[in-house]
From Swiss-Prot:
PANTHER family registered for this protein in UniProt: AGMATINE DEIMINASE-RELATED
Catalyzed reactions per annotation: agmatine + H2O = N-carbamoylputrescine + NH4(+)
SUPFAM superfamilies, alphabetized: Pentein
GO molecular function annotations of the record: agmatine deiminase activity; protein-arginine deiminase activity
Active site: C361 (amidino-cysteine intermediate)
Protein name: Putative agmatine deiminase
Record has ATP-binding as a keyword: no
GO biological process: putrescine biosynthetic process
E.C. code: 3.5.3.12
Keywords: Hydrolase
Gene that this polypeptide is encoded by: aguA
Protein source organism: Shewanella sp. (strain MR-7)
Amino acid sequence: MTNANVDATQLTTKPSQDGFYMPAEWAAQQAVWMIWPYRPDNWRSAGAYAQATFAKVADAIGGATPVYMGVPQAFLAEAQKVMPSHVTLVEIDSNDCWARDTGPTVVVNAEGECRGVDWGFNAWGGHNGGLYFPWDKDEQVAAQMLKQHGFARYSAPLILEGGSIHVDGEGTCMTTAECLLNANRNPDLTKEQIEALLRDYLNVKQFIWLEEGVYMDETDGHIDNMCCFARPGEVVLHWTDDETDPQYPRSKAALDVLQNTVDAQGRKLKIHLLPQPGPLYCTEEESKGVTEGTGVPRTAGERLAGSYVNFLITNDRIVFPLLDPATDDIAAQKLQDIFPEHKIVGVPAREILLGGGNIHCITQQIPSGK
């Protein structure tokens, strides 16, 4: 266990000026970060079920990549009991456990040096539809993770969650208008100004804008639940053939965009369709274990934004959520077809979904650089 309570060195330049860029998720990784779940107003039984699930996810990742977990001081003893012994526990305070969204985006240069981008965070909407208050501890998470690795830090003047962007490492950024252009994120910035900041801090050239993400996604439609890059020129899209399902028009609109765009290298995209599970709904029993607080209520009968696209690529593994016995095997086979060189590892992940996300949302990779 280590302590990361000191800020990382802050830079005054921008990554693109310094020759740094965000690599694709399939680039070599030196670590993956997670954060301990404990909010009783978001996780049933004060996080007990989620903690067991996070341990399984950490174990699956640990077969390919070292895992670090940020844990508030009060929960360190409990985390040591629950987490696999290979996980490095780091004392970090947080309001909740979404490492993808509160952690840093690590950028690299041609020499293999790593630095981190620390985005602004307002709990997915601040006082205009945000998911909890306060979020002051979450705002400090990225700097503490960067300090753990000794990486210098860029502070980006943009409210942005890591789950709202995907890159191919070759100049293309994919995102959703539903999230990035939402009035509850950066209301004073135009689309062009947001693109300019992403060019500065991710060092990308081309943008693929999907209109919306997954139906009922409380993050306002994060791209990482809807569509991701599999490799340069290839994407994986959340899909349903059921034209009566509220997800269908969203996925169909996304498909239309993807079929009629090119990436930063001028390539037409190969599109893999990954079928959605369910539909899945929160049960009475599951909602009962969540206490009232400042978090968004978890209501019985509410549709869950389940998606197999919410997987993590980490070195030679794909760690993906098992969500529905009727479709889990189909998803696993499809992922194996898309990633023939990778080991496909499924982890039962309904418990993460009940809290509002999935495996990609609770992880943040640290690229090797070299």
